[in-house]
Amino acid sequence: EGVKPATYSGYSMPNYEQKDDMLMFCAAETAFLRAEGALRGWDMGGSARDFYEQGVKLSFDQRKVSGADEYLANAVAVPEPFIDPVNPAKCNYTPKTKITIAWNEGASTEEKLERIITQKWIANFPLGFEGWADYRRTGYPEVFPSVSNLSNGVIDTNRQLRRLPFPLSEKQGNSCLLYTSDAADEAR
């Protein structure tokens, strides 16, 4: 049985209205994309670290908050466990990642990628489509496993939804594409 939405009705919701402007692409995202490109060895015109730090600073500027330099210097803070005040037995979660904020030049390429994508996720809030695309592509940032996976085993609880299922008409009329896509998913 899933968690009932009414259980959390006293919590806040994003403060957006239909008439509000919605961000589609921000400067911080550009910096994080360049950081990832530099990390992969592409000529981005700078280092992964420089673009990563620029992305964090641009995100702070966009939100009109101070403290970016102090934030970037924090080599101690790691993701905290989530303690659900309403349903702790079912919804508490302790992150597996120990990623910090401060850039660590000695870290593995994978850890650096996790750091970049995690900060990109934060900077892009509330653009869920960007976060979902990055998560599908990289597996970062670490997200809570599904509390109520009602897919009958079709969707992995920890890996979660990676792509939308093909409609029946596509399965019946274009099976070659379907098998190619399934093979690509299994290779990831």
Question: What are the language-model segments listed below?
Answer:
Residues E1-A6, D43, F144-S175:
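Aromatic-residue-lined binding/catalytic grooves and analogous aromatic/hydrophobic interfacial grooves
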Residues Y179-R188:
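Single conserved hydrophobic/aromatic residue that forms the stacking wall/gate
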Residues W42-A48:
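Structural helix-adjacent loops and short alpha-helical linkers that scaffold large soluble proteins
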